[in-house]
Amino acid sequence: MQYPKVLLLGEPFNDYSGMGITLTNLFHDWPKENIAVASYNLDVSLCEKIRPCAQYVPLGGASFSQSFATRRSYRRKGLKSTLRACLGRLYSKLGLSDLRHIPVTSSLLDCIESFCPDIILSALGSLDRIRFCEEVLQYAPDSKLALYVVDDWPNTKFNGRFCQWWWRKKYDVAYKRILAKADVCMSICQYMSDAYMVQYGVQFYPFHNPVEVAKWDAIEKMRKYEEGVFSVLYVGKINRDTQQPLKDLCDAVTELNRNGEKVIFDVYSPNVKHNIDLSKYKGCNIFSQVPNAEIPKLMKSYDALFLTLGFSEISRKYVRLSMPTKLTEYLVSGIPILLYCPEEIALSKYVSEYGAAVVCNQPDKRVLQQSLLNMIHSDEYNDCIVSRARDLSLRHDVQIVRERFRKTLSSVV
């Protein structure tokens, strides 16, 4: 079985980010000696634990703009923090991060020379990373280029900037230039592949995060709460795409509890302290994120799983072709899904096409409340949803997806 030597450029293997989890799952079977990583924010000890590699090359820490974002999240009120926040927003609006030059370090050149990658795989993500990838290719003339895109950043990264029209043109020209150099392109879902074929005339092979169906089936359901209580779980980040939808469900749960229902909504998130306060909602709780390995057991202890993406114009544009990493885990969990998101985005289309979730496409708390009420009082309805979701999850089984991924990369060597 052929496993080409792959240098992963720009993204690390990890167990906490969508990209890191997906890449870890896709490359799970790769021999250690055939995979190397050159990445930002590289945690070698974590890689060694979950996805060992032949070589590791750190490319640096967080960018200037990312450091501003981090400081804003944890800032104290005061003149200095206010000025820092204003400067950070100005930095983002000017798009200064895209003007950076990312150097090709001697350690990276040594890796390319000694490892001799058959393929350099990059997710890119910005203009400066496109230029960096192009420069790296000059030092690896015999390596093939594989691109993997999971968000529609080529069409949205510049939203909100000054001279947006100028940045749009810059991104379009640069992305088309790197696409012309690519030997194989991959996307996060078929909807993105179809859209990019129309826009760029390039075939993108879809690869979503695979799931170990057998592993999930072996986990028994153990209720967290007593009989008679309908429990709902959300696991994930709290950001501009999810904050308002989470509050909408909290309002719906609070109203149902006031009307005599017994409903609990639990949120597990890595950023619980800084983005949302659930103390005013009845039956709603927020907890720190649990280790990734404990999530399957946690999911199977609830009556419903809440999955959402935002309804704002900014969110709609950014996530229109995206597919959440955790979707496959939701599908295989055996727990009915309550999906709350715009109708036109890829996630809604995919799940609705197969009837794999209770779908609420209107940003209306009353409609969301009624959808939840239907789930509370109809086991037959929930069982039907679960059955369809499981059938859909089989398409994403690790054995199928990993082999297709291996063949796709091997085909260009």
Model-predicted regions and their roles:
Residues 269-273, 284-302, 310, 363:
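Conserved active-site histidine-acidic residue motif and adjacent donor-binding/catalytic loop
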Residues 1-69, 204, 212, 253-259:
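N-terminal subdomain of nucleotide-sugar transferases
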Residues 26, 110, 128-131, 135, ...:
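Membrane-proximal helix-turn-helix segments that form the acceptor-binding/catalytic region
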Residues 44-101:
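A conserved catalytic-core segment of Leloir-type glycosyltransferases
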Residues 363, 367, 379-410:
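A charged, aromatic-enriched C-terminal amphipathic alpha-helix characteristic of glycosyltransferases
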Residues 191, 209-210:
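Carbohydrate-associated surface elements
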Residues 212-218, 224-279, 288-293:
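Conserved catalytic-core segment of nucleotide-activated headgroup transferases in glycan assembly
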Residues 241-244, 293-295, 305-328, 337-349:
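Nucleotide-sugar-dependent
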